[in-house]
Amino acid sequence: WIMGHMVNAIAQIDEFVNLGANSIETDVSFDKNANPEYTYHGIPCDCGRTCTKWEYFNTFLGGLRKATTPGDSKYHEKLVLVVFDLKTGSLYDNQAYDAGTKLAKSLLQNYWNKGNKGGRAYIVLSIPNLDHYKLITGFKETLTKEEHPELMDKVGYDFSGNDDIGDVAKAYKKAGVTGHVWQSDGITNCLLRGLDRVRKAVANRDSSNGYINKVYYWTVDKRASTRDALDAGVDGIMTNYPDVIADVLSESAYTAKFRIATYDDNPWETFKN
């Protein structure tokens, strides 16, 4: 999965997919009542990027729905996965459940079209704080209450705080999550980060009793660091330059082992090294 980083304006969906992304990451900020409000990152952000592009969250979902609904004039067949980077740092811990509830209602209405031929992309809810695991509970219980529990088949999870792998496992246990787990590792492109924790995550994925289904690394903009991440066995790379990742994937060293995921590739299925 080539994951376009910080895609927060509708116009950027086309831009990143046209550069080779089959997945995008979108920042979601919340108001003080835990309503998802804007797709917005803010300053500071990655080096070389404009930090302030934004839409209202529900407006963005409308654009995203069009981009992932077959038959729509804006449809991109290859856009198959969306990571919502949920900026829950502005919330109190006890608001996490409400944030999950409100997020589910927004997606149900504006993305899934109440379950009637909505957008088809798989969704990863990426949460920065292990203490906010109840966001997952709120999300799940709301879709059940709204009589669309089947949509959870399209939803996966990530805790993005670079926490100890064992602590992440405990948070999933509390949330009752037993699959659909993406594990991120990384740092802003302005700084360097080694691959030690990525290798631990890959080892967990490849073990017989691990909780991780997929591992992705962020934010990778250079050919050398792309090769290092692929050599470590990641499933996804988040980038500001999808064309760079696509170029490296077409090198003879990688074409035998990797290909770009399509809609038929189940993002919750573990593919071991």
From Swiss-Prot:
GO terms for biological process: killing of cells of another organism; lipid catabolic process. Disulfide bonds join C45-C51, C47-C190. Mg(2+) binds at E25, D27, D85. Expressed by the venom gland. The active site is at H5, H41 (nucleophile). It comes from Loxosceles sabina. InterPro entries: PLC-like_Pdiesterase_TIM-brl. Its EC number is 4.6.1.-. It catalyses: an N-(acyl)-sphingosylphosphocholine = an N-(acyl)-sphingosyl-1,3-cyclic phosphate + choline; an N-(acyl)-sphingosylphosphoethanolamine = an N-(acyl)-sphingosyl-1,3-cyclic phosphate + ethanolamine; a 1-acyl-sn-glycero-3-phosphocholine = a 1-acyl-sn-glycero-2,3-cyclic phosphate + choline; a 1-acyl-sn-glycero-3-phosphoethanolamine = a 1-acyl-sn-glycero-2,3-cyclic phosphate + ethanolamine. Binds 1 Mg(2+) ion per subunit. This is Dermonecrotic toxin LsaSicTox-alphaIB1aiv. One of its GO terms (molecular function) is lyase activity.
